[in-house]
Every structure is written in C-alpha cells, then in structure tokens.
C-alpha cells in the first residue's frame, strides 16, 4: 500500500486541477506537512483556486530570456521537485522509470502553466520577470499559503 499522500487519486486530482477544493499537501511523512526541496533559490508558491503546491525550484536564469524559455526551465524544475518529493516519501523510483516520471511531471506543469490555471505569487522581495505580462507585478504570498 502506498502512503496516503501518494495515492493515485490525489495525484490525479492534482494534475487535473479539479474544482473540488482539495489542497495538495506536502509530501512529508506527516499529514499536512509541506516540504522544501531544492537549492536556496527564490521561493515561490504555485497556487490554483483549489490547490496549493509550494516549491523552491522556481528558476531565475539571472539574465533576460524569452518568456517561453523561462517557462520551460520553470516546468523542468517543478517536475524535478515533485519527482524527488515522491521518491523521498513514497518510493516511487520502484514504480516509474526516473526519466519517464520526470518528463511526465514536467510536461504536466508546462501544460497547466500554459492553460493559465496557476496563480504565482512571490515569497521574497525580488520580482521575477514572469512568463506573461500578468506576472510582472506579482502579489506577495500570505504565510498561510506555505
């Protein structure tokens, strides 16, 4: 049996962005715990109206780049975070081939971001040059979001 945070139903709910009001909790061993993975880059909270998923791997390339390039890098990093999270708490490495899972997660984040289902808010004082014009002046996150 997989632990509760790793159930297929919850993953499907997350990826399908349902309107059920479900909040995606972190992948830690304790219920409701949130994890912080990745290098100490800019902290971001990635939210939809019914889901909250926080990651530390929002990428800032440090130089001007086309929005699509930034979105691709962000998607890859978000996919890597989720993959590492599942491995650490669920042992998913025994279920998925690493490359296949990483690519699947990254493509999912990329598709969701393109569909504008995510609202991104900043947790630090730096305004990340966002992927679209609507993200150039990001509202600060509430601490309850993380």
UniProtKB/Swiss-Prot annotation:
Listed transmembrane segments: 67-87, 95-115
Membrane topology: Multi-pass membrane protein
Cytoplasmic topological segments: 88-94
Annotated localization: Membrane
Superkingdom field: Eukaryota
Name under which the protein is recorded: Stress-responsive DNAJB4-interacting membrane protein 1
Keywords of this entry: Membrane, Signal, Transmembrane, Transmembrane helix
UniProt topological domain (Extracellular) ranges: 27-66, 116-146
Gene Ontology molecular function: protein homodimerization activity
Keyword Transcription belongs to the record: no
Signal peptide: 1-26
Lineage of source species: Eukaryota, Metazoa, Chordata, Craniata, Vertebrata
Keyword DNA-binding attributed: no
Function of the molecule: Promotes neuronal cells survival to stress conditions.
GO biological process: protein folding
Cellular component terms per the entry's GO annotation: membrane
Induction: Down-regulated in NT2 neurons subjected to stress conditions which triggers neuronal apoptosis such as oxygen and glucose deprivation, followed by up-regulation in surviving cells.
Subunit architecture: Homodimer. Interacts with DNAJB4.
Expressed in which tissues: Expressed in brain with higher detection in neurons than astrocytes. Decreased expression in Alzheimer brains. Detected at protein level in brain and cervix.
């Amino acid at each position: 049996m997989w632990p509760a945070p790793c159930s297929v139903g919850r993953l499907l709910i997350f990826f399908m962005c349902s309107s059920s009001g479900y909040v995606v909790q972190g992948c830690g061993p304790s219920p409701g715990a949130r994890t912080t993975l990745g290098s100490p880059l800019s902290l971001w909270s990635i939210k939809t109206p019914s889901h909250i998923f926080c990651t530390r791997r929002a990428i800032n390339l440090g130089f001007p780049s086309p929005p699509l390039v930034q979105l691709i890098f962000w998607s890859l990093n978000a996919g890597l975070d989720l993959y590492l999270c599942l491995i650490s708490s669920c042992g998913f490495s025994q279920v998925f081939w690493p490359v296949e899972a990483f690519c699947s997660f990254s493509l999912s984040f990329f598709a969701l971001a393109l569909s504008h289902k995510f609202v991104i808010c900043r947790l630090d004082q730096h305004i990340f040059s966002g992927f679209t014009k609507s993200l150039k002046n990001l509202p600060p996150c509430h601490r309850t979001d993380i």
